[in-house]
Regions:
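Secretory-pathway luminal glycosyltransferase catalytic domains
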Residues: 48-150
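Residue-level recognition of conserved structural "scaffold" positions that shape functional pockets
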Residues: 18-21, 142
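Lumenal/extracellular "mature" regions of secretory-pathway glycan-modifying transferases
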Residues: 1-13, 17-18, 25-87
Length: 150
């Protein structure tokens, strides 16, 4: 079974195209299953934006409810554990759970709006959740012809 690359979609059509493109490039180069999270950002979008890639011939499936639950559980656990670590200084116990419960799973957030080469060299042995806008064509330039066909 291949590792999964889950890409969080957010914003309008232009942003979604960039997010899909980085996901497609990483999944293509690392033989990963591409999954699009078209749900978590659009629940309470103040601009009423929606998933807009359904008119394209994309090569990805949409995220399931179970996958969303796992991602949110991990995200919330990490937020709470950071607060506990800072306030109480308890980190050995929490690190044990992080390593044993989530070692197969990695959430990557965009650090800045500029190109980050490290993102293209991510581990293909883990399921990965990408969260960011990824607005540089450098992320997907190598598969430009594939994207144009889609």
């Amino acid at each position: 079974m291949h590792s999964k690359l889950i890409v969080k979609l957010m914003g309008g059509l232009g942003n979604q195209l960039f997010q899909y493109a980085i996901g497609r490039a990483i999944s293509e180069n690392n033989n990963m299953e591409l999954v699009l999270d078209n749900k978590t950002s659009y629940k309470n979008d103040k601009y009423k934006r929606v998933y807009s890639l359904n008119n394209f011939k994309i090569k990805a499936r949409l995220i399931s409810r179970e996958e969303i639950k796992r991602i949110l559980w991990k995200h919330n656990f990490e937020r709470v554990s950071r607060v506990i670590e800072r306030r109480l200084g308890i980190n050995t116990f929490i690190n044990y759970f992080r390593i044993n419960l989530f070692s197969h799973y990695l959430i990557i957030k965009e650090k800045s709006l500029s190109f980050d080469r490290e993102i293209l060299n991510i581990s293909k042995n883990k399921d990965i959740y990408l969260n960011g806008y990824w607005g540089s064509e450098k992320y997907f330039y190598d598969i430009k012809s594939i994207l144009q066909e889609e």
